[in-house]
């Protein structure tokens, strides 16, 4: 039996809807936080920063509320998280800040089916978006609701919606919220440091460098 042909207009309509469906999936962590996802090239990323207080097995990640406790966690190489300036309202927008010991913990920081991206996965993302000098503008949320002016050239063409969550230094000092977004990779640079990627309000670059593992910064997850 001959199958009926799909009218061209209908075919176009269907094809335009499919990407939206693929990009509208979500994942939920053990705290009940729901993360929208976006497909960029061959990768699927969360559109929000991680905000869980539990490892994948249900164990609680210690919350740290003082400078002294934060520095101690880093020195003892123990996992920890905090809100920027210990203000839970910041978590609603920017997620939690984690030290690298939480990222690297064998109990798993990312939800099941997801993981913390390696530096090579970040670099693959950058390459797909046109390289280091162009990727940043395509990854940053548009406008200055959360980013400091001028949030240079931000288009968010990728749908990644990168936010400037700032950081908590290993000795316990909050800086750069509104100015810079930092995200851990799963890869260490040395015994004391690990690799991260960053976006800035001042340029359109996706930069990579390293910081002390006791620093608290944002985390984005990528699908297995």
Regions found by a protein language model. Give the residues of each.
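Bacterial Sec-dependent N-terminal signal peptides
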Residues: 1-25
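Conserved positions within compact, well-structured domain cores
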Residues: 3, 23-224
């Amino acid at each position: 039996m001959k199958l009926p042909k799909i009218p061209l207009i209908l075919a176009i309509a269907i094809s335009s809807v499919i990407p939206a469906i693929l990009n509208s999936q979500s994942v939920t962590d053990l705290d009940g936080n729901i993360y929208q996802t976006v497909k960029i090239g061959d990768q699927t990323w969360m559109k929000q920063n991680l905000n869980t207080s539990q490892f994948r097995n249900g164990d609680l990640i210690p919350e740290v509320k003082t400078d002294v406790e934060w520095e101690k966690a880093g020195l003892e190489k123990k996992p920890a998280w905090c809100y920027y300036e210990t203000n839970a309202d910041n978590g609603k927008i920017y997620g939690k800040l984690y030290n690298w010991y939480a990222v690297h913990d064998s109990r798993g920081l990312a939800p099941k089916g997801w993981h913390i991206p390696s530096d090579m996965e970040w670099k693959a993302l950058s390459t797909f978006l046109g390289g280091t000098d162009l990727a940043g503008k395509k990854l940053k949320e548009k406008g200055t609701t959360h980013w400091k002016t001028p949030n240079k050239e931000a288009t968010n063409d990728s749908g990644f919606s990168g936010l400037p969550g700032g950081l908590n230094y290993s000795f316990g000092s909050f800086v750069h919220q509104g100015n810079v977004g930092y995200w851990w990779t799963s890869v260490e640079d040395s015994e004391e440091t690990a690799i991260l990627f960053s976006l800035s309000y001042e340029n359109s670059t996706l930069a990579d460098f390293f910081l002390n593992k006791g620093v608290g910064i944002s985390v984005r997850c990528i699908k297995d």
